[in-house]
Amino acid sequence: MDIFMGIATADGGEGLRMLLGMAGTKRTHALMDAMLTMSGEAKSAAFLQGLWAQVSIYRGTMLSFLKNYDVILCPVNALPALEHGTSFNPGIVPAFSYTIAHNLTGWPGAVVRCGARSEGLPVGVQAVARPWREDVALAVGNHLEAALGGYQRPPLTA
């Protein structure tokens, strides 16, 4: 989590602000506001180089783990889907740790619905494969989707 946040905010949030401006964004989500606030000052090139070295070590560790497996199956997030309007708490960011962990590798993954909470909100599973094995991630995602019923529209309430 620290590596991801360090890289995402290494420029003091200027890159995010630039993208928001290019997109014509007038209002941002509370989590984006929190990330921009946490950005602080731009970090040094040496600091960023150290973070990328940690990413390389992390990728090597993950690749060693995957020597014995074709795919990792894991939750998408540490929490089930949130009800609309409840994700404004910046303290929820650690719940995205499963997604962030695999985003750091840059490796292929597929996310599919595997069920639903009692309220009808979807629960997902992600399949993450080795580098350059999109075919494996997509095949596993396709199999899971077929076996578990695929996309089902959640109930919409006002």
Predicted regions and their residues:
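An anion/phosphate-binding loop that grips the pyrophosphate of nucleotide cofactors and donors
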Residues: Y69
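Structural helix-boundary/capping segments
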Residues: Q49-A53, G60, L104-A158
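Generic structural marker for isolated residues within well-ordered, non-membrane alpha-helices
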Residues: L16, Y98, G141
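Short helix-loop capping/hinge segments that flank enzyme active sites or metal/cofactor-binding pockets
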Residues: G6-L63, R113-P122
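Short, surface-exposed loop/helix-turn segments at secondary-structure junctions
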Residues: D2-F4, A8, L79-I100
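Glycine-rich, N-terminal phosphate-binding loop of Rossmann-like dinucleotide-binding domains
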Residues: V76
